[in-house]
């Protein structure tokens, strides 16, 4: 695993982090405010900075004392309710958005360590796990062995899922585009509110960062011939090879594939279904449907939850910014 530590931007990010309680298992920054993206947001020098903080109780109670004004009306219900909303609704993450901090506009999501580990290993929501399949800047990380192991496994699972949706031979860009798109499969925001060229806009300017993130996994994988200098890869597309890959997919994705393929009344076990899928010429399409079955409901629940966690006014402003970004992308493509 090669999650990227801070470089020149480290001091600015750490200054922002100093405004929050210190008890963080992991803090990372992501998005167009951190990594250059092609497309309509490429010229935004002061793009909003996106953060995710991985925490344990009683983080919200401490943050409410320091940053009361960051929260919506839910703050009057207290930290216990906020934590319950965070863990039990949407994708397990609580976002405060459109916050001014150290002269920058920021958005930060808060997720519990245990919920993140579950998502990284099993892809229950593929929400924050999906963010961590793309290049991010690690601002802080403790020595939690279980979390570090789960971060590594999430990257390996992303590679395996992408392999199943690719042909026998493909390029690095093909692979990284599939990986970057995993957590957008079925995401309704890609229809309303997001620039539809978003995945390519993420990958093309950041090929070196993707290589840094996935290079060692590809070099060590027995499933692929990786010609790094040529930027090309070859994988085993035999039913046996695909079955091996399907059996190592995260549990929730396996269950969704089983649900899609299992006829009513059959009640086959997951392994039997995956063996059938391995022999199916449309194996990659089935995997894609399984991903969409995870992402679609979790993205919708999380966006609905955002109305309450951000408050109605901020939700309207934030949605307007997203729609403006989508419009700029459409104008750019048609001009």
Swiss-Prot record:
Cofactor(s) needed: Mg(2+)
Q: Which GO terms describe its molecular function?
A: phosphatidate cytidylyltransferase activity
Q: What is its EC number?
A: 2.7.7.41
InterPro entries registered for this protein in UniProt: Tam41
Q: What domain of life?
A: Eukaryota
- Which GO cellular component terms are attached? mitochondrial inner membrane; mitochondrion
**Annotated metabolic or biological route of this protein:** Phospholipid metabolism; CDP-diacylglycerol biosynthesis; CDP-diacylglycerol from sn-glycerol 3-phosphate: step 3/3
Record's keyword terms, sorted: Lipid biosynthesis, Lipid metabolism, Magnesium, Membrane, Mitochondrion, Mitochondrion inner membrane, Nucleotidyltransferase, Phospholipid biosynthesis, Phospholipid metabolism, Transferase, Transit peptide
Q: Which reaction does it catalyse?
A: a 1,2-diacyl-sn-glycero-3-phosphate + CTP + H(+) = a CDP-1,2-diacyl-sn-glycerol + diphosphate
The protein's location, in the record's own words, is:
Mitochondrion inner membrane
**Signal peptide positions on this chain:** none
Q: How does it sit in the membrane?
A: Peripheral membrane protein
Q: Which PANTHER family match?
A: PHOSPHATIDATE CYTIDYLYLTRANSFERASE, MITOCHONDRIAL
Family affiliation: Belongs to the TAM41 family.
Q: What does this protein do?
A: Catalyzes the conversion of phosphatidic acid (PA) to CDP-diacylglycerol (CDP-DAG), an essential intermediate in the synthesis of phosphatidylglycerol, cardiolipin and phosphatidylinositol.
Q: What is this protein called?
A: Phosphatidate cytidylyltransferase, mitochondrial
What is the protein's species of origin?
Answer: Bos taurus (Bovine)
């Amino acid at each position: 695993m090669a999650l990227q530590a801070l470089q020149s931007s480290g001091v600015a990010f750490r200054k922002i982090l100093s405004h929050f309680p210190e008890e963080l298992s992991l803090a990372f920054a992501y998005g167009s405010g951190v990594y250059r993206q092609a497309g309509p947001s490429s010229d935004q020098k002061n793009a909003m900075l996106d953060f995710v903080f991985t925490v344990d109780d009683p983080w919200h109670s401490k943050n409410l004392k320091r940053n009361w004004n960051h929260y919506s009306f839910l703050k009057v219900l207290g930290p216990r309710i906020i934590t319950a909303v965070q863990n039990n609704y949407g994708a397990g993450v609580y976002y405060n958005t459109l916050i001014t901090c150290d002269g920058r506009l920021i958005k930060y999501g808060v997720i519990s360590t245990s919920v993140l580990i579950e998502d990284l290993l099993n892809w229950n929501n593929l929400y924050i796990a999906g963010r961590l399949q793309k290049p991010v800047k690690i601002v802080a990380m403790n020595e939690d062995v279980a979390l570090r192991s789960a971060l590594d496994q999430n990257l390996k699972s992303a590679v395996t899922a992408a392999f199943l949706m690719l042909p026998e031979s493909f390029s690095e860009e093909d692979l990284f585009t599939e990986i970057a798109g995993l957590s957008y499969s079925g995401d309704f925001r890609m229809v309303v509110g997001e620039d539809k060229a978003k995945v390519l806009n993420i990958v093309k300017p950041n090929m070196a960062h993707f290589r840094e993130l996935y290079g060692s996994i590809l070099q060590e994988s027995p499933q692929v011939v990786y010609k790094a200098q040529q930027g090309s890869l070859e994988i085993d597309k035999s039913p046996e090879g695909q079955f091996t890959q399907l059996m190592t997919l995260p549990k929730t994705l396996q269950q969704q594939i089983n649900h899609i393929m299992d006829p009513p009344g059959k009640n086959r076990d997951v392994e039997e279904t995956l063996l059938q899928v391995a022999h199916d010429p449309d194996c990659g399409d089935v995997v894609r449907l399984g991903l969409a079955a995870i992402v679609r409901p979790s993205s919708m629940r999380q966006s609905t939850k955002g109305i309450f966690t951000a408050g109605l006014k901020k939700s309207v402003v934030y949605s307007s910014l997203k729609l403006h970004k989508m419009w700029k992308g459409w104008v750019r493509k048609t001009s």
